[in-house]
Amino acid sequence: EEAVTEMKIIARIRTELPEKFGVPRQSGLVPQLRGRVIFEPEYRNPDAVRGLEDFSHIWLIWQFSRAVREGWSPTVRPPRLGGNRRMGVFATRSPFRPNALGLSSVRLDRVELDPALGPVLHVSGADLMDGTPIFDIKPYLPYTDSHPQAAGGFTDGLAHAPLTVACDPALLEHIPADSREGLLGVLAGDPRPRYQEDPQRVYGLSFAGHNVKFTVDGDRLTVIAVE
């Protein structure tokens, strides 16, 4: 009889995005977006990350902790298809899946040994909300994990050009200096749902403790306030 192990949270990621709105749709889309992986006390032994600093990228296995539902549906409506077409849940990366697990490839910028927190992984390009629980971490292996000729299914040909972001430099001063490029990258990626195109609508994005308000007209996003 198979033994099914209950997964334990080994770490949580800290990012500037406390809400779902604004989180990049996939890892790597906003390489400027920084985060820190902080281990739970039980897993803060520096020996557990020995040698990890030699890898440029890592895999994070995590849970869509705010999307866990009872039961599941065999089909979902991918946002990339405008929410109008159903696909099999296992042919998508929808959070609404049986175990609500996510998989992200992120850049490992450095490993810090913090006196209080133990080993802290500084990463960039993550697509996770602040506080997301992480179940496992594995090194990215270029010789086996990279598939340049892979077919991307319904996502092939769906790439969208980034928006042009207009923002008064004085507004950006409200954001910590080392987080500004991440914010601009998130905005350029167009955080709006695909079906919302009203140029008069004002959107609010929670980022680094601030509410960033903006409008979008065509391919131009204008930041109107940072509160």
PLM segments and residue spans:
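Conserved positions in beta-strands of structured domains
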Residues: 14, 106-109
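Mixed-charge, low-complexity intrinsically disordered regions
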Residues: 1-101, 113-122, 126-227
